[in-house]
A protein has these predicted regions:
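Conserved acetyl-CoA-binding loop-helix of GNAT-fold acetyltransferases
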Residues: 75, 81-98, 106
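Conserved beta-strand in the GNAT
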Residues: 47, 53-62, 66-74
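A short, compositionally biased micro-patch
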Residues: 41, 63, 107-109
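A short helix-loop-beta-strand connector motif used in the catalytic cores of GNAT acetyltransferases and
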Residues: 37-51, 69, 142-145
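Short amphipathic alpha-helix that is part of the acyltransferase structural core
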Residues: 1-32, 49, 146, 155-204
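Small/polar loops that bind or transfer phosphate-bearing groups
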Residues: 9, 105-106
Length: 204
């Protein structure tokens, strides 16, 4: 495969990112995004580019001063299986660590991909920032089919079983025994540079 490069998104990438998302909505694994929303947050994205075309993208979306989310992670179906998705997540994790976030989270139908990168599956309620920011307004809030996964980003941060052994979510009891996970030592590549937006408070 021709060399793939990873870089920070720009407003000019918004139409290509929008097409990627729209072309993959039928999978049921992505939430729709408006072109205006993508334009507003274009510099939060890392895009993968091959021969001048955007073939994959992912957004580092702040949920609070300490927690960021992997959002709108999508790889064009014609180039899947080439480790582009894992590379995007690694780039986001490195950028999140460089910006001082303590935790990177994702809500996904395919948690195994994230577990391979060091994430831990946790009950949804262990990511209250996401619940407050997005989930309570979602029509599937009480019957969500996604898994919550988290990755500690700060040096010295460990995931320990200090949370409750189980929580109630969506009317069912969810086992909640976390594993100890050492922080991944990720080096930022510079693909995603800080933006003015990163310094503003994120509303609940």
């Amino acid at each position: 495969m021709t060399m793939v490069t990873f870089r920070q998104g720009t407003e000019a990438d918004a139409p290509a990112v929008n097409r990627l998302i729209e072309d993959n909505l039928q999978s049921g694994h992505l939430l729709p995004r408006t072109i205006d929303e993508i334009l507003e947050h274009a510099r939060r994205f890392i895009v993968a580019e091959r021969d001048g075309a955007v073939i994959a993208c992912a957004e580092l979306a702040p949920l609070s001063a300490t927690v960021a989310e992997v959002r709108s992670l999508v790889v064009d179906e014609h180039v899947r299986g080439n480790q582009i998705g894992p590379r995007l997540v690694t780039e986001l994790a490195a950028a999140g660590a460089a910006r001082g976030f303590a935790t990177l989270c994702a809500f996904t139908h395919q948690p195994s991909h994230f577990v391979k990168l060091g994430f831990t599956i946790v009950p949804h309620m262990w990511v209250p920032e996401k619940i407050a920011h997005d989930c309570t307004s979602c029509p599937l809030f009480r019957r969500c089919g996604q898994y919550a996964v988290t990755l500690p980003l700060r040096v010295g941060v460990h995931v320990r079983p200090e949370q409750p052994a189980a929580v109630i979510y969506g009317g069912r009891t969810v086992g909640a025994r976390r594993r100890n996970v050492e922080r991944l030592h990720l080096q930022p590549s510079g693909a995603l540079a800080p933006t003015e937006e990163d310094t503003r408070a994120v509303p609940a």
